[in-house]
Amino acid sequence: MMEQLLNSAPSWTNLVIFFGLGLALLFAVLAFVTYGILAERKVMGFMQGRYGPNQVGGRWGLLQTVADVLKLLLKEDTIPKAADKPLFILAPIIAFAPAFMVLATLPFTDAFQFADIGVGLLYYIAVSGLTTIGVVAGGWASNNKYALIGAMRAAAQMISYEIPLVVSVLGVVLLTGSLNLNDIVEAQKDVWYIFIQPIAFIVFFIAAVAELNRTPFDLPEAESELVAGFHVEYSGFRWAFFMLSEYVYLFAMAALTTILFLGGWHPVMFLDFIPGAVWFALKFSIVVFVLIWFRVTFPRLRADQLMELGWKVLFPVALLNIFVTALIQELFF
């Protein structure tokens, strides 16, 4: 879509097009974050036998997250005296920017994608890891022992689970023969990869939850151990940036899971009269629901359990999946 607009427009309007589409993407993502948080709180409330937000914005609490955002914007912006001020200020931006950048290459339908590059999957993996730099910088700059411990946990966790996540998607790349996300979706026109690569899907999904720092892998911000972890000294809109990056990554990871394993916008058999955008939204919503379900259901792992799961279980299983996939490809295709 982006290329068509740019090719049909005079060169002086390219900047305006980029800016306008960037704003549209930003507002779409912020709308998801706003009501994604509300949906998460309502689902968690339902699973725990509570009502959830039900006061601000009517019976369903539709304006609860809006009120929370306004509260954060009006809060005092404090910086600890002992903090490294420039790095303390930059860290939330460093954490948030990559989360927003990865969305540009995700195809939501066959006609709606901001940037179709040949190595979209590689781009996503490379850029998504940059957020950890902001997390580590924020923990270090805070000059707080709890923040530093949380930052070190985040770095160790990213290294431990980025590798199984990358290795797990290599099976998909072997089957498709491409790193282009559109090609990966088109290759699933007849059969989704969740049925062909179930082991890869399980490894990818577990590693994705760890990458998102969500329960049961939320050690970097474990409230019962580290108060709030790496962002313990942050408040107001700077804290909101860290929160936004987490939920934007939730959006991106759910979309990537849909693209890699659930056929993207391709419909279920005999239901192809339903638009592709509806199918993508439905699959995406199911993935988000499962991520919320994980948060409510599982207890937090210990640090040693988290490391062992990543290096002793997920990584070997992902390697085995590559070997089996390559062997089958060589013998039968």
From Swiss-Prot:
Q: Which GO terms describe its biological process?
A: aerobic respiration
**Where would you find the membrane-spanning parts of this chain?**
15-35, 88-108, 117-137, 159-179, 191-211, 250-270, 273-293, 313-333
Q: Gene Ontology cellular component? A: plasma membrane
- Is Iron-sulfur among the key words of this record? no
Localisation = Cell membrane
Q: Which PANTHER family does UniProt cross-reference here? A: NADH DEHYDROGENASE SUBUNIT 1, NADH-UBIQUINONE OXIDOREDUCTASE CHAIN 1
Q: What protein name does the entry list?
A: NADH-quinone oxidoreductase subunit H
Q: Could you read off the lineage of the organism from its UniProt record?
A: Bacteria, Bacillati, Bacillota, Bacilli, Bacillales
Gene this protein is translated from:
nuoH
